[in-house]
Swiss-Prot record:
Described purpose of this protein according to its UniProt entry: Involved in the cellular response to hydrogen peroxide (H(2)O(2)) stress. During H(2)O(2) stress, prevents oxidative damage to both DNA and proteins by diminishing the amount of unincorporated iron within the cell. Binds double-stranded, bulge-containing, bubble duplex and Holliday junction DNA with approximately equal affinity and ssDNA with lower affinity. DNA binding shows positive cooperativity. Cofitness analysis suggests it might be involved in DNA repair pathways.
Keywords linked to the UniProt accession: Cytoplasm, DNA-binding, Stress response
Listed InterPro entries: YaaA
Gene induction: Induced by H(2)O(2), via OxyR.
Family statement: Belongs to the UPF0246 family.
Subcellular location: Cytoplasm
Residues spanned by motif Helix-hairpin-helix: 35-66
Protein name: DNA-binding and peroxide stress resistance protein YaaA
Amino acid sequence: MLILISPAKTLDYQSPLTTTRYTLPELLDNSQQLIHEARKLTPPQISTLMRISDKLAGINAARFHDWQPDFTPANARQAILAFKGDVYTGLQAETFSEDDFDFAQQHLRMLSGLYGVLRPLDLMQPYRLEMGIRLENARGKDLYQFWGDIITNKLNEALAAQGDNVVINLASDEYFKSVKPKKLNAEIIKPVFLDEKNGKFKIISFYAKKARGLMSRFIIENRLTKPEQLTGFNSEGYFFDEDSSSNGELVFKRYEQR
């Protein structure tokens, strides 16, 4: 079973590390090509392209400039500990045991605009380059054209290595669009999280993102290997709704807190 999640815009390079083990990203040659393109952008161009403030654009221009191909614990940190968004609040990787990290390293992958695919312990230098950004490059008009089949092929390698054919899609649509489902040697299961609001169940972005992290943690902590085991997920009040679920889509609901 291979879990896919999105990266986060918020990064943490200050907190104490809970493991000293690390690996290196497997697609750095591609990352270096994107950095070459990104370095051509001025801060105002970055601001327009990413729809971010001038201050953030300046920070990210500096990150592109400072990025170097030699990754060490001195200039990078493990991806699963560097990302700090809503998904990672639910995941709480900073509390993982070494055995948890081992399982995650085999069964969890983070999709990334710059790095393509990251394993949890892969070192990562700070960046911001969302998958949906239209950064022109030698391979096309955006990052989807840049990555082509590369991400899908890397995921197929991971599936083959564990002798499995199930992908748990906990990534956002923006990121999963970088995967070619028809070329993926796997059955794709997509958990959906609905929260009650004024008597109706719907996807509420903040809660749904955190729930994706909670589900990832549930799989890792319990060493789950079969998709049917996911129906036991009950973190923070969620429950499986079989009637609303269908082939390939598992629906979890949570009542409004009153």
